[in-house]
Amino acid sequence: MSESEKPPEMTGDGTGQAGQAAGDESDLGAGDLETVEKLRESYNQIRAELGKVIVGQDEVLEQILISIFARGHSLLVGVPGLAKTLIISTLSRCLSLSFSRIQFTPDLMPSDITGTEVIQEDKGTGERNFRFLQGPIFANVILADEINRTPPKTQAALLEAMQERQVTAGGKKHELDEPFFVLATQNPIEQEGTYPLPEAQLDRFMFNILVDYPSEEEEVEIMKRTTVGQEAAVEEILNGEEIIQLQEIVRRVPVADEVIRYVLRLTRATRITKDEAPEYIKDWLAWGAGPRASQYLILGAKARSVLYGRNHVSAEDVQAVAYPVLRHRILTNFSAEAEGVSPETIIGRLIEDTPVHDTGKAGAAASG
């Protein structure tokens, strides 16, 4: 199954039955089920509103929304001019969230992101005190543009905010507003003079989302829309409080043990030192995915199932989020590069070879 294929809704096969079993043991009450239905309707409305401004990019939009409702952060990889900034700014308007764009440059300092303390004098008493001036990180939606163009010290300040949802300045911790979502961008072409994110920091991003060129028909529509001098109005669908409530619902969606075991087989099959790893994994990978991949596969599958109006997770949900979760967590070696094998190729083969049901040979995928 390729990333471009939209996984089907629940089917009547064994995968669907596994998901339904989880639904029977649901921790969601009647009120929660109403909230699930509301999120499905809101998702369709958000997609319709985004469609007024954004042409195409359906997978990108779905994956960004999944990561938001799963309380994750995403790394967006694509060449300039593919509407990355427009997507995020438009989405923040649909969700009634504050938006901030940070352009990462080699001279950007951590305080330029987090904020700084300044001395403020009381005119009445003459007393001087420190006052914290918030930086651009204090917004609900952050676009970290070209994150690999700034030094590691500044990258670390952003990553602390992502992980801890707070910043440290002057020895004091300052909580960030919720909901909080970071979307960082990278240009895959220009790598000279950049500071690539190490694997340990890449692992903190829930999704690695690829933005490709539009199709011919989509590009025609883009030219028609952007050369007439009119800007479409976007309606607000949700607000921050509702998003936080929906994020809590996503966390409570039950997952059948069989689906959890399926996720485990997928991730463990990428680890070259494990017996479960197929031969082609050992031939093509230098390193595999860690436990955080399994966690994000489950969270992403939960969020997707709710966006599609279901209160249980199926294997199709896992497969739909496998590409953005795994592509930056598996490291190809020189043999794979020499043979033209990409992470997408490897992930696709893993999905094809890994059984959904436990056959008694956990991880016994076809060797290559």
Segments the model singles out, each with a brief description of its role:
Residues S2-G31, E37, T273-G368:
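C-terminal engagement/docking regions of AAA+ P-loop ATPases
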Residues T35-L82, R268:
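Pre-Walker A (pre-P-loop) alpha-helix and adjacent loop at the N terminus of AAA/AAA+ ATPase modules
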Residues I68-P106:
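Walker A/P-loop
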Residues V79, I113, T185:
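P-loop (Walker A) phosphate-binding loop of NTP-binding proteins
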